[in-house]
Design a protein with these regions (language model features):
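Short secondary-structure boundary/capping segments
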Residues: 6-7, 33, 53, 101-102
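Extreme N-terminal tail/first-helix region
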Residues: 1-15, 137
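Charged, gly/pro-rich active-site loop segments
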Residues: 72-137
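Helix-adjacent hinge/juxtasegments
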Residues: 51-82
């Protein structure tokens, strides 16, 4: 993955997650930590929350991470596709290192393993986009 994409993902902390809930679209905002070794967002969610129930039933998800700005020249963000699954022990460590206060809540954690990312960064040139796709094995 291009370092410009990774740098943006590292500096942000909130994503918008889109899932299908019984065939209907549903969105949720999630704080995230990022597993750079596996290129996965790590998010928390209660097992009874709508977005978790939805991606446990249909693990293909999509989402965005965007810089909040009204200045066109500073627009920056990613759109992504991913597969959701329970987080590994190592991913739990990554999440709690970023959000140590979450330990007290003992949340269920999930990894959104990236399969495709489109990064828009107008500071690189208006409408400049970088696309990354995971190699198929």
């Amino acid at each position: 993955m291009d370092e410009k994409i990774l740098k943006f993902i590292r500096k942000m902390h909130l994503l918008s997650l889109a899932v299908l809930d019984d065939g209907k679209p549903y969105c949720a905002s999630c704080f995230y930590a990022f597993d750079e070794d596996n290129l996965a967002f790590i998010v928390a969610g209660g097992e009874q929350s709508a977005h978790v129930k939805a991606f446990l039933a249909e693990p293909c998800v999509a989402g965005t991470v965007a810089l909040d700005t009204k200045i066109v020249g500073k627009i920056e963000g990613v759109q992504f596709r991913a597969l959701a699954a329970p987080a590994t022990a190592q991913q739990r460590k990554i999440y709690f290192a970023r959000f140590p206060y979450a330990l007290a809540m003992n949340p269920s954690l999930y990894a959104l393993s990236l399969s495709w990312v489109k990064f828009t960064h107008n500071a690189l040139g208006f409408g400049k986009k970088l696309v990354w796709q995971r190699e198929q094995i």
